């Protein structure tokens, strides 16, 4: 598993309202990307809190959907309007199969060569008063050699990102992440 990460604050802000984490529990690799609502320090704090809580619950033994449901309930009970979008990838390192859960998150992309498939769901972020019966399940993935999964936040324009991914050629994950961020600054 190879990762590339890049984050930039909105319009020159020194703080980015996004946060991410990558960790392993037994044979499962988890990748989390959260986008706090708003910009700057407040958004960053919301995103980092979501990451911290989800990571703690998953490493304690909760299944990913259960951890997300608990985070949703916590935000609803707290009722302070602070919330974060969630991209949560759970990938079995032995089989390369996994689930991608998206709550309120910008689209993700699966790239192989010049082919790009957009992945998105209609679930709102946790804490917006939506019960589990209105949440969509995750998207099942079976990753193949040479495929790249790209997770983005709403700071990256969809059309520009898709175009870049179709035409960028073979890049390392780090180079690809830098190119995706460049799409945001050019738009």
Q: What annotation goes with each model-predicted range?
A:
Residues 1, 44-113:
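Catalytic core of PPM/PP2C metal-dependent serine/threonine phosphatase domains
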Residues 2-17, 68-78, 106-140, 172-173, ...:
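PP2C/PPM family metal-dependent serine/threonine protein phosphatase catalytic domain
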Residues 11-13, 25-27, 80-82, 94, ...:
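Short flexible coil/turn linkers enriched for glycine and charged/polar residues
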Residues 8-10, 27, 37-38, 105, ...:
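Short, glycine-/Ser/Thr-/acidic-enriched flexible segments
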């Amino acid at each position: 598993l190879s990762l590339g990460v890049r984050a930039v604050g909105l319009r020159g802000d020194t703080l980015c309202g996004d946060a991410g984490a990558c960790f392993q529990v037994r044979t499962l690799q988890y990748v989390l990307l959260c986008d706090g609502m708003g910009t700057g320090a407040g958004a960053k704090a919301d995103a980092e809190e979501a990451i911290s809580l989800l990571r703690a619950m998953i490493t304690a033994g909760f299944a990913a959907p259960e951890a997300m449901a608990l985070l949703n309930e916590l935000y609803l009970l707290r009722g302070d309007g602070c919330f974060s979008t969630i991209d949560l990838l759970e990938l079995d390192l032995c089989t390369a199969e996994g689930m991608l859960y998206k709550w309120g998150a910008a689209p993700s992309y699966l790239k192989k060569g010049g082919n790009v498939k957009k992945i998105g769901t209609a679930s709102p972020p946790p804490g917006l008063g939506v019960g589990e019966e209105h949440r969509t399940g995750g998207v099942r993935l079976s990753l193949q050699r040479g495929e790249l999964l790209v997770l983005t936040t709403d700071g990256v324009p969809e059309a520009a990102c898709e175009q870049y991914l179709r035409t960028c050629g073979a890049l390392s994950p780090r180079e690809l992440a830098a190119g995706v961020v460049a799409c945001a600054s050019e738009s």
